[in-house]
Amino acid sequence: MRTLKRLLLIISSITILLIGWFYLHIHSNIKLPTATYELSIQPGSNLKQISQQLANAGIIPSQWTFIILARYLNQESAIKAGDYELTGNLSQIALLDYLIKGNAKQNEIKFIEGWTFAQIRKVLNEHPAIEYKSAGLSDQQILQHIGASETAVEGIFFPDTYYFIKGSSDLDILQRAYKTMQNHLQNYWSERVESLPLNTPYEALILASIIEKETGAESDRAEIAGVFINRLRKGMKLQTDPTVIYGLGEQFDGNLRKKDLLADQEYNTYTRAGLPPTPISLPSLASIRAALNPAETDALYFVAKGNGESEFSTNLA
């Protein structure tokens, strides 16, 4: 009996010592290699990998205390990937809380109004913090990856600034931009004026992309939309240069010639009636709004005045 009591006493003492040692370790300040240390946690990293990374960097004395702490708090899978800037005095428990809250440094990328998909792919490919997973994928494969129902990639991504953590894939960002565009497009489609000669939201997107390339003047968008709507209603050709330029692709040298306007191709709105088969650029929210809420006008023509604005008329005189 005395031996058993002694054994229990020893076990209790060891347990108390271990608890005390563990408490001391998780509340003691970690050691940063530099005054400000950037910790990069890659997407998909598990607790063991993160703990080993911290231990290898000399930030924590042992990976096991960090693992036990996270499991004890039931936060084994709660640490968020990203780039973290560690400064000042942090304990292991404070570090865990910091990583769980996901206060990671955000990277950003901008998609600009009027851009083509080729320009989007270029900036995605050149961004050092983005994993370029679309390399080698066809347009159709990209559409499949992002869950798009469209058959062409042009114009379906919303122009905006997108924030992301280092290591995010270009496909993830494209999917966000696609869903954002769909949300905006559906919202404005549901509020469109009646009797528009546009049968689907996608046709509205096509028209909006043309409006985007025709003017940079906010005050002209609705009026230009009104002209195009009038021409569509009357069965007139749109006769808009930006669609021809888009159809020429790399053949366009900056100078649009008469022969270009006469040469038939699927984006030549001088030779073909109706809308082109796809959008030609990323339309802004203002252009989408104009396409679905055009100005009430009798105008059928407009010409640039040279100051970024346009002059409208009912005839060519």
Where are the regions that the model predicts?
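N-terminal Sec-pathway targeting helices
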Residues: 1-14
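Alpha-helical interaction segments
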Residues: 11-12, 74, 152, 257
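Hydrophobic alpha-helical targeting segments used for export or membrane insertion
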Residues: 12-20, 24, 202-206
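Signal peptide-directed extracytoplasmic domains
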Residues: 18-185
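Bacterial extracytoplasmic/cell-wall-associated proteins, especially those involved in peptidoglycan
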Residues: 46, 121-122, 126-134, 144-317
